[in-house]
Amino acid sequence: MSESGHSQPGLYGIERRRRWKEPGSSGPQNLSGPGGRERDYIAPWERERRDGSEDPSTNVMQKTPIILSKPPAERSKQPPPSTAPAAPPAPAPLEKPIVLMKPREEGKGPVAATGASTPEGTAPPPPTAPAPPKGEKEGQRPTQPVYQIQNRGMGTAAPTAMDPVVGQAKLLPPERMKHSIKLVDDQMNWCDSAIEYLLDQTDVLVVGVLGLQGTGKSMVMSLLSANTPEEDQRAYVFRAQSAEMKERGGNQTSGIDFFITQERIVFLDTQPILSPSILDHLINNDRKLPPEYNLPHTYVEMQSLQIAAFLFTVCHVVIVVQDWFTDLSLYRFLQTAEMVKPSTPSPSHESSSAAGSDEGTEYYPHLVFLQNKARREDFCPRKLRQMHLMIDQLMAHSHLRYKGTLSMLQCNIFPGLPPDFLDAEVNLFLVPFMDSEAENENPPRAGPGSSPLFSLLPGYRGHPSFQSLVSKLRSQVMSMARPQLSHTILTEKNWFHYAARIWDGVKKSSALAEYSRLLA
């Protein structure tokens, strides 16, 4: 056959027949039929030569069934001219597969494309799947595969994109605070900066402090939270009173300072209650008082009551620091703050009415009396018993938990005393002077130029070391029970919002307003 496809007359003779028989197999050959001889006796190398010399347009049409590798596709390749006019109504079904295949390629990549084409039996590449608009099977393709692709994309791509970030955020340690920040400023306004350090977890302990001016509240809170006695006081998280401030008779802390440790313990340091320096500042600087207060000393006392009532509502433990035993006005102040304390919101009216009294639903914190700068004679067992008995009598009518949660006898501070030595043991703890350790480093001498007496023995102090007592106090405070502050369990962030509402309620309290009118 020539390149044009017509037969040549001299090629069907005996010579051609014999020439083809020589290289071929010796099996039987069928020479019957008008075109059977040409179709049966074409050699393989002759077929390759003829295929290469054919028109490229026909070659493209012959390669299509080879790619799809489907015998039925050869029969369907002839009617493209008849289906060509039907192409214009096809764009409507074509738009859906193209748009809905995009999330499959973004979420699953090439795996989604192969997975969608394999069960349908169409061409592997995604662009060729919507090209042939055929019968009913083609019309079902935009609905069923797309529904499966959407589920796979949303079920696998979203978790893989979010889980690593969420997992890393949970594994990261909380941000460590290096110094305290303001929770309530000197103008008695609430500050929102502390919420950045809080987490969504419920295991939190809140410790507050109250005390007169110069008793060492900031130093005690720094030692309990993050510092040690050996560190420089200027590096404490709660700034202690400087020497210049002591000489001027001023106060270092104003408002309420906030600090949270890595153990998720919140410490609240407050300004001194009934402070004469704050009163002097109001009088000498001509600060304008709020309209509801007429006298400066009334305003100072109401500020102190607001802070104390706030701590009694939002703290698990409140430490009352005093540097001498004892000031009766301090206990009178504590009873007044307990009286004007905001009531704890009850879960329902039925439960509060069924209780019959406010004691069952009202919240009261643990109260710890800390005797700072204690002398040697204060650690005498007889003096210790008198102190416990007096505090028990002064706080006999209080609902605050001032006894039963802290004990110096159980800390092995007095190893010779029996556990029942104190008839009425209250939450009292004694801490000596911080500088007493340096004084004991110089042992007594017999004379100016003589050697020290008992140089091989430590000096008698009458009490354990300052570091040991602070460590025992810290362990007891941190191991105290954490009662529920509200009728619902509060996380750290929930506690912050709860405290903000309590502070706003304290400032607008009708009980405090009535008490201020009685003072005037």
From Swiss-Prot:
The keyword Phosphoprotein applies. Involved in nonsense-mediated decay (NMD) of mRNAs containing premature stop codons. Is recruited by release factors to stalled ribosomes together with SMG1 and SMG8 (forming the SMG1C protein kinase complex) and, in the SMG1C complex, is required for the efficient association between SMG1 and SMG8. Plays a role in brain, heart, and eye development. Belongs to the SMG9 family. Keywords: Acetylation, Nonsense-mediated mRNA decay, Phosphoprotein. InterPro entries: P-loop_NTPase, SMG9. Residues 1-94, 107-143 are annotated as: Disordered. One of its GO terms (biological process) is nuclear-transcribed mRNA catabolic process, nonsense-mediated decay. This is Nonsense-mediated mRNA decay factor SMG9. The gene is Smg9. It comes from Rattus norvegicus. The modification N-acetylserine is found at residue 2. Self-associates to form homodimers and forms heterodimers with SMG8; these assembly forms may represent SMG1C intermediate forms. Component of the SMG1C complex composed of SMG1, SMG8 and SMG9. Interacts with DHX34; the interaction is RNA-independent. Phosphorylated by SMG1. Residues 112-121 have a biased composition (Low complexity). Coiled coil: none annotated. Residues 36-53 have a biased composition (Basic and acidic residues). GO terms for molecular function: identical protein binding.
